[in-house]
Amino acid sequence: MSKVYTNFTVKGLTEQLNKGKVIVYPTESVFGLGCNPDNENAINTLLKIKCRSWKKGLILVAANYTQLFKYVDDRYLNSLQLSRIFSTWPGPFTWVFPARSSTPMWLTGKFSSVAIRVSNFEPIRRLCLTFGKPLVSTSANVSGYLPARTIHAVYKQLGYDFPIMNTNVLGLPNPSIIRDAITGKIIRK
C-alpha cells in the first residue's frame, strides 16, 4: 500500500524537496509538480510521472531573480530587453533566457536556453524562499491531458502519493505566457 500524504506546510515541503521528492503545489492558474532543479533523480521521477520527454526542457519558478542567476546567462540581453522582462515580474510571465553552460540538460532539454518565472503568488514565494532556490515547475498532469486545477483532479490523474500543499490556485484562467527573452516573441499564450 502506498503512503498517502496529507496537506504539507512550507517547511514540510522543503524537507521533501531536500529528500529528492516530487511535490504538488498551487500556482497562479493550475496545480504544479515541482522538485529540486539540481537533483537529476528528482527530475527523472517528475518526467516519468508526467510521461514527458526530457527534450522539452522545464520551467524554473523563483521568489526573485537572484535565485535564478545560477541557471541563466543574461549577458546576451541588453538593458531594454531586461527592462521589458523585469516590468512583468513578479507575475505570471515566463521568459526563455539563454542558459549558462553549466545549466544541466535535464533542465534545458534539447535547447541552450531555460524558461524562468519570478512569481508573485505567495505560496510559491514562501516555498522558494524557504527552500533557498527555485523549483522546477510544470503542470500537475500527464502530458496531453488537461492541467489539474483542483486537488481532486491531481488525485484523479496522478494518484495520492505526493507531498501536497493543499491551497487553492490563484485562479488565473491560463498557464503563464511564455516569451523569448531576446526577441520578445510569444512561445505560448
UniProtKB/Swiss-Prot annotation:
Gene Ontology cellular component list: cytoplasm
* GO terms classed as biological process: regulation of translational fidelity; tRNA threonylcarbamoyladenosine modification
Q: What is its EC number?
A: 2.7.7.87
Q: Does the keyword Cytoplasm apply?
A: yes
Decide whether keyword Transport is in the record: no
Alphabetic keyword roster: ATP-binding, Cytoplasm, Nucleotide-binding, Nucleotidyltransferase, Transferase, tRNA processing
What family, per the record? Answer: Belongs to the SUA5 family. TsaC subfamily.
Name the record gives this protein: Threonylcarbamoyl-AMP synthase
Source species: Blochmanniella floridana
Q: Per UniProt, what is the name of the gene that codes for the protein in this document?
A: tsaC
